[in-house]
Amino acid sequence: MVAEDRISQLEDTSVKELTTVRLRPETKAYLQSQSETLGVSLSQVINMILDGVVSMEMKPASDNKIKGIYDRIMSLFELHNINTVDMAKMLSGYGIKLSHIRNPDKFIDILSMDMIKEIANWFSINYKWIIGETNELYSPRDNTWYKDSYGFSLLLLEKSFRHSDLKVSVVKANNVSFEKAEKLEEQYSRLYVGFILSYTSKVNGVSFTKYEVCEFQRWNYNKCRGYLRFIFYFLDSVRTRINCQGVSFNEEIVDGLMAGRLFPSTIKGMLSETWFIAERIGHIESNYDVEINPVEYLNRFNRLIRLFRF
């Protein structure tokens, strides 16, 4: 099945009408020579040329859409270091074989929306990105922590029991220091801090590293800072269970993560600096930047930490 037929069928149901075409002498001479060579009338040659032009204009749109879906799916597996043999294993439930993966047309013929959504779920990707309806790979807003540090910490703890190799990367931009961000006005020193989770996932016997990009918020804003400090307190208290590291990247990388335009797997080899979350906890008992009694909030965290230790 050709690509354009896979997307849509263009049917000519219009009534034919006579049309007068004015040709330059040299053009008419060329077309007449072609009509004699092909053994058809001049009008038929003109129709053939026009049909060919329309076909060439229409075909790339359909071909590019299909190729885009195929390429985006392939890129997801490649970025997670999954080869074609393992890819076929993961997709075997949909009847996908190695021969389908190596042939875009065969692959697209079997592709279904259910398969697209499952692939998206495997890699924490927005399925609409796969089909070309959005440029946003994922939404960091799907994993929020602002005003609910406890809920986010509980989520991390639950994930650590399901995935023993859970790693939490606390990401910030390296354009400004924490101290400077607290002192200067936000418009001059905006500093975003967020989280990337990574852990081993397994599908049909194939293991790969899965990434989740979580919410980014401003260290400049005292309330965001207050909730972040409670998360830092929790992570530092369970550091023997959950591997956590503070990392700094340039603003472009952080902006790309915040906007859902950058695959988190691609930042591993990029230049970064490390920092220690323990140095940013402060006097947690008097952390009045949260919209709750800090002592009561701290007690909830301590009970959670004790449960983990037992």
Segments from the language model and where they lie:
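Short, charged recognition helix plus adjacent turn
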Residues: 133-157
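Recognition helix of helix-turn-helix/homeodomain-like DNA-binding domains
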Residues: 14, 18, 91-111, 118-120
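DNA major-groove recognition helix of helix-turn-helix/homeodomain DNA-binding modules
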Residues: 113-129
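Short, basic amphipathic alpha-helical segments that act as recognition/interaction helices
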Residues: 40-62
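A detector for short, charged/polar N-terminal pre-domain segments
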Residues: 6-10, 56-66
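Short Lys/Arg-rich basic patches
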Residues: 1-26, 35-36
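Short basic helix-loop element that most often maps to the first helix and adjoining turn
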Residues: 37-41, 67-92
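Long, charge-rich C-terminal accessory regions
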Residues: 150-299
